[in-house]
């Protein structure tokens, strides 16, 4: 691809991934023309919405699935290090947006909140203690605390300790105070507004991308439909970025690129219990993650979360899976069936055969009543009353199913996946957790993989936005502590001030 001063890029979707990428791109290439098309009437309506995403502020401080028990009994914390570094990278970029005036009021989207792990049972307590010792020895997590003392836990998680005095059983908890809660809906809306204000960007709502055609010169002709009038128009662009959440797989298939073959998706909704009693909500001030049931995927990790939504403290417990054919909460019941093609049907069937326990788990979750959900909640909060909680359905996640040399046909991919065409003109983001929390690292991966000819030119611009860019927060303790102190100041978190 010949390099010129200006390029056109179409961003599909106005969720956290598209707006993050767009916010970064307008800073490093202000002369490029950015066209954002969102099928709904405003940004952050699907999985980026604060009521639709599950846990937030994923920094591997309390999520036990990021620290893995090894056959020799040791605890592998390598994934936790990576996730933590990626969240630190996100905080740097958000801090830059605040300092540069692109977005305002950081406390509107990020708030300080302790992150706590809580387990019951002899084996789980041993796991948590071993995890604590492994993490405590590493600078990134050396502020972690651990206790098996119910009196200490009464101070950390008083709501959860109610009703346990007579028979507390074997339990333990670990805590890191310097966690956060992130309102990704509010952050996304702020970034979308900033992109709209950019002179070379347009953000159009109620506009749906319906087709693609690659031209002989390598550019793409993107067909866009106005959902209010039914009118269609064509936008010629150098690059297509598909950040449409659950809608990404069908759109990727429409491009016809070879990389879209042998891919499929399995849609899963999250359901949560939301507390409606302010007196209960006020007694809990933390994110508390438990241990996922044996043989179940990471999305099943139960957690009782303080969340800040519309400036108010709320309390959520879940998740509970809810399977349906829609790829988007505002999608069609035909989404799953339309995504089945002759070139991916064997991939999907292989996934079904390989993952019968997951299918059974999903079915069991679907038929679970509210009372069943409340019984799960009572393992965290024994005195929970039905009348204080409402069951609601959150957003959709589409688990990526693909063929890989290592795992064969029908491998279910957990996490966020970047797929691009061989000529790097089409880029799609697929998958889910910890997607939003690591969205900035995902955007950097997109830049590095698909725009190598700009690497030298862009590096100092990226370094200005993300001071640790090109360096390792995992290996450089001094830099890690410096960055944490700076982002805490920029985002008004109040940590590390002494």
From Swiss-Prot:
EC class (word): oxidoreductase
Membrane-traversing stretches: none
Cofactor(s) listed: FAD
The enzyme's E.C. designation: 1.1.5.4
Pathway: Carbohydrate metabolism; tricarboxylic acid cycle; oxaloacetate from (S)-malate (quinone route): step 1/1
GO BP annotation list: tricarboxylic acid cycle
Family: Belongs to the MQO family.
Protein's UniProt name: Probable malate:quinone oxidoreductase 2
Gene source species: Staphylococcus aureus (strain MW2)
Upper lineage: Bacteria, Bacillati, Bacillota, Bacilli, Bacillales
Gene: mqo2
